[in-house]
Design a protein with these regions (language model features):
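Class I S-adenosyl-L-methionine
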Residues: 1-111, 115
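Glycine-rich phosphate-binding "P-loop"
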Residues: 45-46, 156-164
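Conserved proline-anchored active-site loop of SAM-dependent methyltransferases
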Residues: 56-88, 97, 108, 120-155, ...
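Conserved Class I SAM-dependent methyltransferase catalytic core
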Residues: 58, 100-102, 163-221
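Glycine-rich, phosphate-binding/catalytic loops in enzymes
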Residues: 90, 114-115, 152-156, 202-205
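Short loop/edge segments at beta-strand edges and connector loops
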Residues: 118-122, 215-216
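Flexible, glycine-/basic-rich loop-and-beta segments that form/coincide
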Residues: 223-226
Length: 226
């Protein structure tokens, strides 16, 4: 009901109604429709989708340095813009991608039916995929969102245990776990990873990997894709 909407949000009313119509028409029943909607609501704070120009540029730079992975990981895939950009240069790559939002994950699976597209959180990745991938690339979620990981919780490293408190720190360390020795982690993330006054996670990162490059992007770069 548009009457209940704030005047500043009214321009979003019609697209929202259309989205609900499409979800309802493509859900097998009311229960599935509600699951899709609830999943969308749960992802609102972390769903910042990446402009294609950014993913293409990162893929091009990696290719210029002869980074053409046979095994690629995308831990927060959205609808697969990074997957698409990377497959232009490495069409035969085996890709494993994670997308926690139910609706977005369903779209992702339909777009890439021949790849391993998983509709669940990155924390669900299994131990056999440690030291497995040549490249992990993503615009990872960020913020003070906790992630529980039993392996991290049992770790002797304070940095690994504390990384569970902020999702971007967790994704970095979990991504490093997943790539092989000599592999590359290429993530877009918030300033908190480098700027935080707490150093335990950074120390853990630098104990496991060498920093190849870090580029600061404008803080409004993803506003139109939020």
């Amino acid at each position: 009901d548009a009457v209940r909407w704030a005047k500043s949000d009214l321009e979003l009313f019609a697209p929202t109604v259309e989205l609900h119509r499409l979800i309802r028409e493509n859900s097998k029943d009311e229960t599935e429709y509600k699951r899709f909607v609830d999943s969308l609501k749960a992802s609102v704070l972390t769903a910042f989708y990446t402009p294609k120009e950014i993913t293409d540029t990162i893929a091009d730079v990696l290719a210029d340095y002869s980074v053409r992975p046979a095994r690629m990981l995308e831990p927060s895939a959205g609808v697969g813009v990074f997957v698409d950009s990377m497959l232009r240069h490495s069409p035969n790559a085996d890709v494993m991608a994670f997308e926690k939002d139910l609706l977005t994950g369903t779209i992702l699976r339909h777009l890439y039916p021949d790849q391993k597209m998983r509709t669940c959180g990155f924390e669900k990745i299994e131990r056999p995929f440690n030291n497995y991938f040549d490249l992990a690339v993503s615009n990872i979620p960020f913020g003070d969102i906790a992630v529980f990981d039993a392996e991290f919780q049992r770790s002797d490293s304070f940095g690994r245990r504390s990384a569970q408190k902020t999702i971007h720190n967790y994704f970095f360390l979990k991504g490093l776990d997943a790539v092989r020795d000599g592999g590359i982690v290429a993530f877009i993330t918030s300033q908190g990873v480098l700027n935080s006054t707490k150093t335990s996670v950074r120390n853990e990162l630098f104990s496991q990997a060498n920093l190849v490059s870090a580029i600061r992007l404008p803080n409004n770069l993803f506003t139109d894709n939020a």
